[in-house]
Curated annotation (Swiss-Prot):
Assigned GO CC terms: large ribosomal subunit
Protein name (database record): Large ribosomal subunit protein bL32
Keywords for the protein's UniProt record, in alphabetical order: Ribonucleoprotein, Ribosomal protein
Gene Ontology biological-process annotations: translation
Pfam family, one: Ribosomal_L32p
Molecular functions per Gene Ontology: structural constituent of ribosome
Signal peptide per UniProt: none
Family designation: Belongs to the bacterial ribosomal protein bL32 family.
Length: 57
């Protein structure tokens, strides 16, 4: 079995993980009510998607 010869230091470990991060979700403004919502999803505030009322409130 493969076993590491030396312990991985904190610096080396953190340098390897520099690209391992969470990206910010794409938020857009709803054209109906002006609230911020996730792209390509129904607005939680007014229930519209692409200018049409999808969810009745």
């Amino acid at each position: 079995m493969a076993v590491p010869k030396r312990r991985t230091s904190k610096t080396r470990k953190n340098k390897r993980r520099t690209h391992f991060k969470i990206s910010v979700p794409g938020m857009t403004e709803c054209p109906n009510c002006g609230e911020y919502k996730l792209s390509h999803r129904v607005c939680k505030n007014c229930g519209s998607y692409k200018g049409e009322d999808v969810v009745s409130k």
